[in-house]
Amino acid sequence: MQLTSFTDYGLRALIYMASLPQGQMTSISQVTEVYGVSRNHMVKIINQLSRAGYVTAVRGKNGGIRLGKPAQSIRVGDVVRELEPLSLVNCSSDFCHITPACRLKQALSKAVQSFLMELDNYTLADLVEENQPLYKLLLVE
């Protein structure tokens, strides 16, 4: 299974924010600069993460974005569920004539659930805490 760039950059944005000192604000521009992604794309991602409570956005002169909850309470599997369309095949009867007898959808569904259950074993904190090489790459002190 390959994650969409939307989910990939959503996870990267959260990793960046989790690497900062707790509560420190950053900006969408800073995140886009670190990862080399378009600002418009990142704005859409941050908006969805904000609606889901993973990011807090503060407007104004001293505003910015930061994690909306502690890194240790954000499970990677939950973020993927929020951002990723998880339907691996199009099983509409108009599209596929074997849908009534097909067992592939069930097998793929079980595989996706196993994938997500494994990701649920990791929090953002697990990915960033005591990860000096990551801090160096992200230019975080």
UniProtKB/Swiss-Prot annotation:
Binding-site residues, [2Fe-2S] cluster: C91, C96, C102
Pfam families: Rrf2
MF (Gene Ontology): 2 iron, 2 sulfur cluster binding; DNA-binding transcription factor activity; double-stranded DNA binding; iron ion binding
Cofactor note: Binds 1 [2Fe-2S] cluster per subunit.
Entry-linked InterPro entries: TR_Rrf2-type_CS, Tscrpt_reg_Rrf2, Tscrpt_rep_HTH_NsrR, WH-like_DNA-bd_sf, WH_DNA-bd_sf
GO BP terms: negative regulation of DNA-templated transcription
Ranges of residues in domain HTH rrf2-type: 2-129
Assigned keywords, A-Z: 2Fe-2S, DNA-binding, Iron, Iron-sulfur, Metal-binding, Repressor, Transcription, Transcription regulation
Keyword set includes Cell wall biogenesis/degradation: no
Signal peptide: none
SUPFAM superfamilies: Winged helix' DNA-binding domain
DNA-binding feature ranges: 28-51
Any one Gene Ontology cellular component term annotated for this protein: cytosol
Cofactors, names only: [2Fe-2S] cluster
PANTHER family: HTH-TYPE TRANSCRIPTIONAL REPRESSOR NSRR (PTHR33221:SF4), WINGED HELIX-TURN-HELIX TRANSCRIPTIONAL REGULATOR, RRF2 FAMILY (PTHR33221)
Function text: Nitric oxide-sensitive repressor of genes involved in protecting the cell against nitrosative stress. May require iron for activity.
NCBIfam families membership: PRK11014.1, rrf2_super
HAMAP family reported for this sequence: HTH_type_NsrR
Record protein name field: HTH-type transcriptional repressor NsrR
Gene: nsrR
